[in-house]
């Protein structure tokens, strides 16, 4: 055979589709002949391979003019193998495939983050699977897990470029760790879900301080929590707040990073205030209670509700005292000191009822005005009540002769003064006293007492001597004697009578 005309007669692929692992070879067979087709042994053939494949630079033909060419690569894809001798060459393509046995997670990238934690809006990652030499692997099943209660397909399958997107949803705001695994290879990335402000609602409204003093400064406190529809806390949310019963509160508050904010409520009005927190169409209400400020207890009112009682020591005049704080809130359970003058009797202290009032009963055996004073702290008020003498017990207290020894001329009078009092010695005016006089004396049958309980009784007589004058009222009476004397200014010889006659004329 003519070596001078050596040429590549054939280049045939005899093994193809090997793994691109750098050791498993694709194989070709080259045949060298002369110009007339005669096989040429011992010919050196130059070999090249494209796309990063590895091949011996020369091979030598066997006695039959053929030689096998082994080509390896770490790069999946087509490699063009060219065999040349003299000016003759031929090329054939061989294909290396990625090595599924060494499949690994080459990349895991977050391509969309901070999705809303609404259970439907997804964060997205892209995973890339390659073999040990970085060749992309299609059709590979990748296992996926997501933490913090996020939802994800348990497996995804790579596309022709070795990648696949992973969609992750959650109803839980916060960080979710997403892990992609194949064989013993895994990578993890964090994605973040944010609470859904479009569904913001008042999740909780809790009273954390209650029963503050209604002084306009001391606050009752509530803690409010705002979440989305799935219970994720929402920071930075503006919440509207109202409070009734004249309580004062900021009209809006803004939630902290944990979704909570404290609401301070003050009032000058004791009682219950309903506090309402609202966002979007969501609202919650809670009651807080303000209590009257005992430190500023004062006598707000002292009113006479019953007056003019009898001074009998048992029938009472009544007053009502009302105790409030500095802002007019009624104070229950407060001890009020009470004094009454002019001999009246009263409990030294009384205790206010739930409405801040208490009645004060005052009795007396002394008719007249009694000043009643109620005191708490440094606050006092006074009112007058009047006790009247008890006509039911009217009696003749005194009957005194103030003029005596008048002439028994039927016109010149002896005079007495009668005094009428009740059982406790209180003078009784306007009382009708019955009068009688003995020994033919003349007097008015009744007299009426003056404002001081006294009245004068005039008695005349034409009969000299003692006359017993009796004054009576109810079952009480007193008597005094007055004396009438004969009227010398009218002396006359009333009689001249011989009482002894015929005596001896003996001068003795």
List each language-model region with its residue ranges.
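Thr-biased low-complexity repeat/linker tracts and other Thr-enriched repetitive architectures
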Residues: 1-508
